[in-house]
Amino acid sequence: MVDIIELAEGVAAEIGDGAEVMFAPEFDLKGIKEKRIVVVPAGIETKPSARDYLEDRLKVQVGILKKCTEDDVPALIREIVSVGRRFLHKWVAGVRCAKAECNPIYSPEHLRERRQFTGVVELTFLSVHRNEE
């Protein structure tokens, strides 16, 4: 069975660019001009797969946060979508990324209220393993 914390750390390492694993991210980016990339272990769904086997769907969210203007948004949207596509079919920590979802792609509220781009892509990794119980 895959450890979701190790998976999140592997995703952050693969992204590079200062990406960091956090468990309760909340940012006010006043005075911060550089982009922040945050990786959060988001959930695990387990179901029976085949006789004596289980399928885990491990979900990791990648957030890009940056103080910006509306003119910066298209490039930031392309970047968050690109992160998701880059992980599809990629193996990290022994599991394969089977899905990347941006829904919504970014938070219009954060853009209006904070002048901050907050975009999230949720990566779903699949693991099939023997039920050891």
Give the label of every model feature segment.
Residues 32-43:
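A short, hydrophobic beta-strand-centered structural micro-motif
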Residues 1-27, 42-133:
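Charged, amphipathic alpha-helical segments and their flanking helix caps
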